[in-house]
Amino acid sequence: MSNESNDLEKNISHLDPTGVDNAYIPPEQPETKHSRFNIDRDTLRNHFIAAVGEFCGTFMFLWCAYVICNVANHDVALTTEPEGSHPGQLIMIALGFGFSVMFSIWCFAGVSGGALNPAVSLSLCLARAISPARCVVMWFPQIIAGMAAGGAASAMTPGKVLFTNALGLGCSRSRGLFLEMFGTAVLCLTVLMTAVEKRETNFMAALPIGISLFMAHMALTGYTGTGVNPARSLGAAVAARYFPHYHWIYWIGPLLGAFLAWSVWQLLQILDYTTYVNAEKAAGQKKED
């Protein structure tokens, strides 16, 4: 009996307490030029998949939005109103961008995260939801997709390019900069609070994100044309072959907005708001009981 138990101990000596076989030790991988950056083949493959997802999602989002914007701005009956201020025109543009980003995020969130916006990617990077490397990897396809979508929309629709960003209603460059900053901050903060924060409703994050972009267009279109996305502004400018001297506000404003949104989100993390919210909920349930 003792011999059998000794044989059994020898046979299972390579198993850990959970029953996992630790007898096989994989050979050490040879060092490569990417080793010091902790980048292996799988990571590069994942970055490539994310880049493809961001390109497809951004292209689909902006192509639909550009074409809708062209239709809204092409109605001759609306020319008596200042550009972007007619209620019907404004609502059509806002709904076009809001719904376009909503279904694009739902389609590609599982592939690349569905940022579709360099400013949103920056806010996700600041919140450590994605790595700096992934942020940079996402920027390039987003910007290229914006230009591709602008070119495709321009080629497929007759007439002038009518989806560019421009200051209007007497808005100055400084006002336009702050409008773009705060409009982008609203969008980025919505992303951080609905997609990054762990909640039961995370799977529905595309809905409030689309609504926030809709509201940003309702508020900003008459004044700045609503950029809140450098890829969107650049793509339209390239398609129209026209860069106003204040085009920089459509880059600096959204990037500052990403920092502003992250600052608010980070303040809430420092205050550990979830602990107090959960405590209040628990106290309320006790009172009801």
From Swiss-Prot:
The keyword Repeat applies. It is a multi-pass membrane protein. A motif (NPA 2) lies at residues 229-231. Residues 1-36 are annotated as: Disordered. Aquaporins contain two tandem repeats each containing three membrane-spanning domains and a pore-forming loop with the signature motif Asn-Pro-Ala (NPA). Disulfide bonds: none annotated. GO terms for molecular function: water channel activity. InterPro entries: Aquaporin-like, Aquaporin_transptr, MIP, MIP_CS. It comes from Saccharomyces cerevisiae. Residues 69-90, 157-175, 224-247 are extracellular. It is found in: Endoplasmic reticulum membrane; Cell membrane. PANTHER family: AQUAPORIN TRANSPORTER, MIP17260P. The lineage of its organism: Eukaryota, Fungi, Dikarya, Ascomycota, Saccharomycotina. Changing P141S: In strain: Chevalieri / ATCC 10604. Induction: During exponential phase in rich medium and repressed in minimum medium, hyper-osmolar medium or in sporulating conditions. This is Aquaporin-2.
